[in-house]
């Protein structure tokens, strides 16, 4: 019903600050009345995904999916009210909405949303806002490392962040973790898919650096994972390629108006 912009104005849209001001105009009684009608298994977000091939499917995620996954992600990152997260990944994607925004909301961390990704703008934000954590895909980290402003950026407040979204070179994660580089000493990685809201496995702050740089960690609490042979459905031994399967609180409600595809997946 409304489009909210961050960092710029567009006709017919609300700026982020205007949206926040309007929120203050809503009586508390009305908020409580609306909240009473919301159920944990109500769909709160629909992400369109097609994987690498196929027709886009609307993944219906519930409050239960999103809040629980965000909470577990924040736990693994050891987020708190002392943290200030720069959100440079898209909010319309699970990386921004759950791994970043919701993990902050469940742990009381401060959010610093960016209107779009720019290595220059992100580095300036780290300086100005004393950022303690941020998430990104490997190409974002590379762009920041290679930017002329990188050496002028103060990373002394930085401590953690997620590198994920595509194959993460261990040497790139190690570089980000170095105290004389990005100072992201507790850098971690996540594995999952949109249908699992999205995280299923993740390393944690405090895990050995080798584990954090060379693996995608281990299953979240209350989530079961296995790797199967897609032809037989049988679990495969360690070291054998197969299809990743998971189940738990993070599993989507289904694909929007696609009952056959839902039945084949859930």
Predicted regions and their residues:
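Short beta-strand->loop structural element characteristic of the AMP-binding/adenylate-forming
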Residues: 57-60, 87-88, 109-116, 188
């Amino acid at each position: 019903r409304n489009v909210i912009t961050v960092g710029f104005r567009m006709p017919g849209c609300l700026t982020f600050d205007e949206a926040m001001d309007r929120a203050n105009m809503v009586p508390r009684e009305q908020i409580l009345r609306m909240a009473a009608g919301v159920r944990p298994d109500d769909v709160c977000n629909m992400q369109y995904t097609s994987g690498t091939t196929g027709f886009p499917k609307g993944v219906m995620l519930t409050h239960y999916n999103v809040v629980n996954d965000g909470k577990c992600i924040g736990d693994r990152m050891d987020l708190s009210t002392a943290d200030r997260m720069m959100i440079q990944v898209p909010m319309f994607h699970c990386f921004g909405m759950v791994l970043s925004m919701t993990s902050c909301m469940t742990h009381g961390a401060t959010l610093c949303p960016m209107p779009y990704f720019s290595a220059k703008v992100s580095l300036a934000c780290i300086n100005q806002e004393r950022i303690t954590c941020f998430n990104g895909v490997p190409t974002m980290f590379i762009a920041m490392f290679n930017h002329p402003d990188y050496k002028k950026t103060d990373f002394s407040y930085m401590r953690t962040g997620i590198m994920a979204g595509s194959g993460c070179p261990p040497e790139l994660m190690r570089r980000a973790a170095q105290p004389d580089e990005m100072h992201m000493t507790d850098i971690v990685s996540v594995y999952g898919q949109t249908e699992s809201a999205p995280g299923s496995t993740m390393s944690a702050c405090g895990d050995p650096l080798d584990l954090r740089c060379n693996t995608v960690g281990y299953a979240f609490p209350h989530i079961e994972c296995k790797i199967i042979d897609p032809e037989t459905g049988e679990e495969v031994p360690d070291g054998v390629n197969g299809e990743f399967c998971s189940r738990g609180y993070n599993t989507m409600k289904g694909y929007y108006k696609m009952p056959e595809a839902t039945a084949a997946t859930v």
